[in-house]
């Protein structure tokens, strides 16, 4: 499911553009990611501490893009809840998750919100964002190393044709 792209449009858009198959596949992967996040938090929360392995467990299976999408939906669905840090709330609102209303006016995104304690979800989100930033930094260092100019041997100057001592 890591290679399946996240469909970021509502069902109405998918219906109008004949993309319902992509929407449904992405929505199923989002629901599976939500369940994986809940299981990871449940399995890795011990002694008032959330192990960083929880993030690795989810990201290896779903990738950062889908994990961030589900976490942004979770925070945006509870924008009234101050147990999410202001930084994470601002990040989630910047993700611009569109409303996905059904025929009765219910936002379908509510079914994709993680159902763990908001403090633990906030901690999981912070750890995920930190892991992503570290991975991006590693990637940029690798790119810099690849782009280093090749060193060339120094050229002998035309003026220094005197014999060496």
Regions found by a protein language model. Name each.
Residues 1-164:
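Gram-negative host-targeted secretion-system effectors, predominantly Type III and Type IV
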């Amino acid at each position: 499911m890591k290679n399946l792209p996240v469909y970021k449009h509502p069902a109405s858009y998918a219906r109008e553009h004949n993309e319902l198959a992509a929407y449904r596949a992405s929505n199923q992967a989002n629901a599976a990611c939500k369940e994986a996040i809940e299981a990871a938090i449940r399995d890795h929360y011990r002694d008032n501490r959330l192990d960083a392995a929880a993030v690795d467990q989810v990201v290896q299976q779903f990738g950062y893009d889908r994990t961030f999408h589900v976490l942004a939906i979770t925070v945006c669905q509870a924008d009234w809840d101050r147990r999410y840090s202001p930084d994470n709330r601002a990040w989630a609102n910047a993700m611009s998750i569109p409303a996905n209303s059904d025929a009765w006016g219910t936002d379908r995104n509510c079914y994709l919100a993680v159902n763990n304690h908001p403090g633990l979800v906030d901690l999981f989100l912070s750890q995920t964002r930190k892991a992503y930033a570290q991975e991006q930094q590693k990637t940029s260092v690798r790119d810099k190393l690849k782009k280093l100019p090749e060193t060339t041997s120094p050229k002998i100057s035309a003026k220094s044709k005197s014999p060496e001592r």
